[in-house]
Each structure stands twice: as C-alpha cells, then as structure tokens.
Swiss-Prot record:
Record note on domains: The cytochrome b5 heme-binding domain was proven to bind heme, although it lacks the conserved iron-binding His residues at position 73 and 106.
InterPro entries: Cyt_B5-like_heme/steroid-bd (IPR001199), Cyt_B5-like_heme/steroid_sf (IPR036400), MAPR/NEUFC/NENF-like (IPR050577)
Domain Cytochrome b5 heme-binding intervals: 35-134
Single biological process term from Gene Ontology: positive regulation of neuron differentiation
Any single Pfam family the record assigns to this protein: Cyt-b5
Keywords: Neurogenesis, Secreted, Signal
Annotated GO MF terms: heme binding
Misc: Non-classical progesterone receptors involved in extranuclear signaling are classified in 2 groups: the class II progestin and adipoQ receptor (PAQR) family (also called mPRs) (PAQR5, PAQR6, PAQR7, PAQR8 and PAQR9) and the b5-like heme/steroid-binding protein family (also called MAPRs) (PGRMC1, PGRMC2, NENF and CYB5D2).
Signal sequence coordinates: 1-22
Protein name (database record): Neuferricin
Organism: Homo sapiens
Amino acid sequence: MLRCGGRGLLLGLAVAAAAVMAARLMGWWGPRAGFRLFIPEELSRYRGGPGDPGLYLALLGRVYDVSSGRRHYEPGSHYSGFAGRDASRAFVTGDCSEAGLVDDVSDLSAAEMLTLHNWLSFYEKNYVCVGRVTGRFYGEDGLPTPALTQVEAAITRGLEANKLQLQEKQTFPPCNAEWSSARGSRLWCSQKSGGVSRDWIGVPRKLYKPGAKEPRCVCVRTTGPPSGQMPDNPPHRNRGDLDHPNLAEYTGCPPLAITCSFPL
C-alpha cells in the first residue's frame, strides 16, 4: 500500500524474465495510435474537484483515469497530491510535499525502479490508460524521450539482477539463525530454511559476495553435482556445492553438521 512519508513503497518485486518484461515495457511505452497527449497544464485540471473534467494521474508519463478509485485521489483524500500530475518519484520516496511530488526519477536505484515498475503494473491492471503527458518522458510527438529509455533500461537491468538473486537463493538458501544471552548463537539448515522449500537440507557455510562487508550464512547442498554443471561435464565428486570458491566453513563447526552452535 502506498504511504506518504516513508521511503520504500514496495508492492513486492515481480518475478519474471527480463526479456519478457522488456517486451511488455515497449508495449506500454512504444508508439500507439489514438492516444491523447496532455500538456502538464492541461493535466493539472484533472484533480476531481467540482467542475473539473475528470480525475487523472500520471506515472512515468502515462496518464490513467483513476475515477473508479476516487476516494483515494479526490480533493481532501490522503493521496490527492498525486492527481492531475506526474508524481512518479513520490511513489518510491513517499514524499508527498510539493517538492516531492515530481517526475524526476533519474537518481533512483535499480530496486526503486522495480518499485515503479510494480506500480505501473498495478495501474495498467486496475485503471484505464487514457493518454500521455508531454515533458520528461514523452515528447510533443508522443514518442518516448531519452529519459524514458533510460528508465526502461534501468528496469530491465533490475529485473535481470532480481532474477539472478532469486536463482542464487535457490542454490544457497539462507540459514535459520537464533541468539540468546544464555546459549549464544545457533545457525542451522532445514528443508525450508530461508523460505526455500527443497528436497535437501544442506549444511551452514559462509558465503562471501564481492562488495559485501560481511559474509552471510547459507545452506549448501552436500551431494550430487555442483549447481549448473552440464550433463556432458567430467564426473563430479558427489559433493554438491561444497567446493564453491566463495564458500567457507564456520570455525569450530563440523564440516557436515546441519547445525552450528557458538556458545558465549
């Protein structure tokens, strides 16, 4: 749910192949016959007040008729500031001040761009797109500007990165962990640790990632071929992913133990 005043308005990241998403983005943003073009001054009249011609908002330059959600966007409602303008940035930052209700998203991170993508999916599903607003994202000819092309590229990169993260989580699920002042800390693996259901348990290992300050605990498969090994590769050692170069054992924990305890 969108909340003004807090950063990180995530609907949850969509799990999809970047190539499919890129095609979808081009379908949303590419040339389309019959679309109405608004100038910002014209769009500002669509705030849902008495005598206004309608209740519209824009996201990444696309204009949506949000009349069916009037109670959320009409004058006096919590999100009335989004009506009659493109306030793309505020969908991520939650800054609903006049300074925050703007369309500049050039400095947002890849994760924040994915948040915008999810909001765009939400509006495409729940409201009717009635046109485009000229300015940052669309030119007077109705075609995407370089700024919108950059947004599309950032979203595609974010989707690729998200896909890789999900794949890594399947290979190296996070460990379960607990700590108490009486017993110290404990790390352990199960068939559902890290929220990843699987047919193996694994053993705790430290996973070192480039750029990360500290390793994190992951569960590592101990039998079968290494993940990603092709069928025509040389015979494996039946050690699963234990020999992955970015992994390290926990000092004081038996190599094949599914639980590592570290008393105080």
